[in-house]
C-alpha cells in the first residue's frame, strides 16, 4: 500500500495536481486545466473496528471492495457509487445513497481525513470518534468539494449496521399515504407516473410494512430498481427518465446537463473558502463544485 509520505511526495507543492479515483464521475465540475499532474491515492483497508463502527481505509480503495468486506461484519458505509468508484471519489463528489433519508448523507460518513494541502504538507481533519470534533467541520467541507480544497489520502469512516432485508414495491400511492404506513422508508422515488418504495430493516418489521403497502395496492418488485446517479442542482423538471426523491428532493438522472444555481452570497463564501485552502488554485484546477 502506498504510504502517505509517498502520496505527499507525488503531490508536491507547486504544480497543478489532481487525484484520480475510478474515473466514474471524472468530468463532474468541468475539465481539468491542461498540464495537470494526475496521481492516485493509497489503496487498501488499514483497520476495522466493528465494535466502534469505524473503518480506516485508503481513499483509493474501491467502494465495492470495502462494502463487500463489511458485509462479513454485517455493516456498511452510507456511500453510493458505480462498481469502479473509489471511497475518496465518492466522498469528493458527495455521492449519497438513494437511501439517504434513512441512513444519512455522504457528509455524515467521514470522521477523519488524512490529507495533503495546497502547500504540499500533510494535515489531519476530524478524528476517529464523533466526540473528537476538532476539525470535524473541515471533513464536511471536503465532502462534495471535488478535491478543490485538499487531497484525501487515508480516511476514517463511520459504519452502520446492515439491514437484514430490503424490499422494493411500486404503485400509485402518494407520499402522505406511504408515510402513514411506513416508519422511515429508505427510499420513496417518483418517475412522473409511478411511486417506488424501498423498505428495509429487521425482517419482521419489513414484512409488516410490506403487507400494509400491498393491501393499499402496491406490488412487490422482483428485482431492485435501477437508479441513475444523483444529479446535484437538478429539480423535478429535470427528471428525463430519472427519479425524484420525495423525501429529500434529490433527483437521480443520467442527464448531466443540470446547472447548480447558487446565490451570490453562497458563491462568495465558496470562493473565500477556496482562497483560504488553496490560494494558488493548484488543486484540481478547472473544477467547480457549483
Please report, for each region that a protein language model flagged, where it lies by residue.
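Glycine-rich beta-strand-to-loop/alpha-helix junction loops that act as flexible
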Residues: 19-25
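FAD-binding subdomain of flavoenzyme oxidoreductases
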Residues: 84-189, 195
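N-terminal glycine-rich flavin-associated loop
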Residues: 1-19, 39-82, 95-128, 163-170
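Helix N-cap motif at beta-to-alpha junctions
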Residues: 172-174, 199-207, 235
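Short, flexible, solvent-exposed loop/turn segments with mixed acidic/basic and small polar residues
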Residues: 42-48, 153-162, 184-195, 219-225, ...
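A common structural junction motif
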Residues: 73-77, 180-186, 211-220, 243
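Hydrophobic side chains in well-ordered alpha-helices
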Residues: 7-10, 66, 174-178, 206-209, ...
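Conserved glycine-rich FAD pyrophosphate-binding loop
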Residues: 29-32, 192, 211-290
Amino acid at each position: 500500500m502506498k504510504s502517505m509520505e509517498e502520496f505527499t511526495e507525488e503531490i508536491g507543492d507547486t504544480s497543478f495536481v489532481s487525484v484520480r479515483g475510478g474515473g466514474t464521475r471524472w468530468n463532474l465540475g468541468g475539465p481539468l486545466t491542461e498540464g495537470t499532474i494526475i496521481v492516485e491515492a493509497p489503496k487498501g483497508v488499514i483497520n476495522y473496528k466493528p465494535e466502534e463502527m469505524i473503518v480506516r481505509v485508503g481513499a483509493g480503495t474501491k467502494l465495492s471492495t470495502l462494502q463487500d468486506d463489511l458485509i462479513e461484519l454485517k455493516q456498511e458505509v452510507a456511500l453510493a457509487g458505480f462498481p469502479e468508484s473509489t471511497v475518496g471519489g465518492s466522498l469528493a463528489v458527495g455521492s449519497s445513497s438513494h437511501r439517504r433519508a434513512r441512513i444519512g448523507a455522504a457528509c455524515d460518513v467521514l470522521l477523519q481525513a488524512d490529507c495533503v494541502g495546497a502547500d504540499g504538507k500533510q494535515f489531519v481533519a476530524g478524528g476517529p470518534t464523533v466526540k473528537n470534533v476538532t476539525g470535524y467541520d473541515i471533513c464536511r467541507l471536503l465532502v462534495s468539494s471535488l478535491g478543490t480544497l485538499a487531497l484525501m489520502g487515508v480516511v476514517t469512516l463511520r459504519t452502520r449496521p446492515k439491514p437484514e432485508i430490503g424490499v422494493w414495491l411500486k404503485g400509485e400511492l402518494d407520499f402522505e399515504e406511504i408515510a402513514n404506513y411506513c416508519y422511515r422508508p429508505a427510499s420513496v422515488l417518483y418517475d412522473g407516473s409511478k411511486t417506488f418504495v424501498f423498505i428495509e430493516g429487521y425482517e419482521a418489521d419489513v414484512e409488516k410494512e410490506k403487507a400494509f403497502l400491498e393491501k393499499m395496492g402496491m406490488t412487490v418488485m422482483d428485482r431492485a430498481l435501477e437508479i441513475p446517479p444523483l444529479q446535484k442542482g437538478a429539480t423535478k423538471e429535470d427528471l428525463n427518465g430519472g427519479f425524484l426523491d420525495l423525501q429529500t428532493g434529490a433527483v437521480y438522472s443520467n442527464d448531466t446537463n443540470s446547472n447548480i444555481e447558487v446565490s451570490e452570497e453562497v458563491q462568495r463564501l465558496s470562493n473565500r473558502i477556496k482562497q483560504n485552502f488553496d490560494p494558488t488554485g493548484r488543486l484540481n484546477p478547472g473544477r467547480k463544485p457549483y
